[in-house]
Amino acid sequence: MSERGFNRTIKGVVVSNKMDKTIVIRAERLVKHPVFHKYTRKHVKYMVHDEKNECKVGDTVIVMESRPLSRLKRWRMLRIVAKAE
């Protein structure tokens, strides 16, 4: 899959693959509290296009931003970084 220009990429863990050609990933990030200066983990779920249905639950994947593919899908899977055990 070719990348057109610079697109945002994120890394996440697959939490659901029950839909056809669609997976749901959970991406975490660290956020610093403005007053207490403590880092906390925030997470968000994204629906991602998986053209070949090759992801399993627990896989770590890298996804890139793309054009809107449906009402909720704006991300496309680039590659699987680590397989689930």
Swiss-Prot record:
**GO terms assigned for molecular function:** rRNA binding; structural constituent of ribosome
Sorted UniProt keywords: Ribonucleoprotein, Ribosomal protein, RNA-binding, rRNA-binding
Which BP terms from GO are recorded? translation
> GO CC terms for this protein?
cytosolic small ribosomal subunit
Q: Does the keyword RNA-binding apply?
A: yes
> Gene3D superfamilies recorded for this chain?
Nucleic acid-binding proteins (2.40.50.140)
- Give the similarity note: Belongs to the universal ribosomal protein uS17 family.
Q: How does it assemble?
A: Part of the 30S ribosomal subunit.
Role description: One of the primary rRNA binding proteins, it binds specifically to the 5'-end of 16S ribosomal RNA.
PANTHER family, sorted? 40S RIBOSOMAL PROTEIN S11 FAMILY MEMBER, SMALL RIBOSOMAL SUBUNIT PROTEIN US17M
Q: What protein am I looking at?
A: Small ribosomal subunit protein uS17
Species annotation: Syntrophus aciditrophicus (strain SB)
Its organism's taxonomic lineage begins at: Bacteria, Pseudomonadati, Thermodesulfobacteriota, Syntrophia, Syntrophales
